[in-house]
Structures are given as structure tokens and as C-alpha cells.
Amino acid sequence: MEISENTLSIMKNFSGINQNMLIKQGNTIRTITEARNVLATAVVDADFPQDFGIYDLNEFIGSLSLVDAPNLDFNESFVTIGDSTGRSKIKYFFSPEETLTTPSKDINMPAGEVKFVLDNETLSKIRRAASTLGHDEVLVSNNNGTLTLSVVDSQNSTSNSYAIDISGEFDANTNFNFILNITNLKIISGDYDVEISSKNISHYTNKSSPVEYWIALEPESTYKV
């Protein structure tokens, strides 16, 4: 079987969430952080013939780049990665499931009190602001009836901040401050439908690709009716 550039791109993104991965038979891949506060799933255009574990996903992706047009031939304990000529081959061994961090179950997403579209341009602005200001938190709040995303230091009220107003669905009579750690916002570039629940979890659905993320909020997040 072959691995497309699109599948490789998703795997590279998932390697930023967790270096290891258990890939199940079929065309759906999933990963979760060691802290179990970020879960990601994607439907890819590769149909894997069996379950197999990869301990170092970046190394595996790098191995695929050693040959042109990599073709994968699966065996019970390893995969042979060959090139288009049949001259070059890589024998890559799998890792046992017990050595990997894997999602134990699907997340039952609670109903979200706040919904909005996070477009790629806004996401890029937030990331740039976080890098420039040296902050690692994104605040989603009701600012006098307007939904606002802010890059802040929630522990320092006099620190510099960046804010951008966006359109969204929420009860204007509620007061909420949902805090996300920017380091957990490891989503692939694109536009997203976002839903945030007062149960301290957020859900991101890519609008152009079957990729989803569930990201826990920081415990200091608040929601008041």
C-alpha cells in the first residue's frame, strides 16, 4: 500500500500531540497526549491492513522519506518500506501496544454553550500574538455581548494582551472565561467549527478535512449564568 501526502501531513501533525501511536486496521487514526488532555482523530485515504504500533512517529515518517513513492508491505511484526524501483528497502519493526499511549475510549462531548468558526487566519493571528507576547493562554470570553478571543497571562492582570472579536453563538446573558493552553492547540492548519462546553472541554472539527480534536480547558475556566 502507498501513503499519500495528505495522510503524511496528518501523521506529522499527530506526532506533535504524541510521538507514539497505535494505528488500527482501517482508515481511521487516533492519538492522545501523555497527559490525556488532547485527543485527535482523522479519517485518512489509506486503508491499513492490520493493527500496528509505532513508538517514534517522527522516525517512522522520516523513514518513509528515505525512499521515493514509498510502498508498504505489512508483516506480523514489521513493515517493509520499498521504493518505486524495488532496489531500496527499509525493514521497520512495530512496537507492542503496552509501550504506547493510546486512547482508551471515545469522548462523549457534552452540549456546548459556546459555538463559533475559527478560521485559519484568526488561528494564525492568535499563534503569532502568543509568540510575540510570550503568553501561553487563549481566553474565550463574553465581552459585553461580543465573543472575544484573547491572548493573555491570566495570572497577571497588568500584562500585555491581544484580543480579536469574532462571530459566535452563545447566551449573551452568561459570563464565561474559557482558558486554553496554546501548547495544546496543536491543530492542523484550516478552518474549524468549534464548540466549547462548561464541562471544561472543547471540540474542533476541520471544515474541509475529516479531522477532529478534543482539547481540555484549563481548570481555572469559569462559566456563570
What are these regions, as identified by a protein language model?
Residues 1-93, 112-225:
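DNA polymerase processivity clamps
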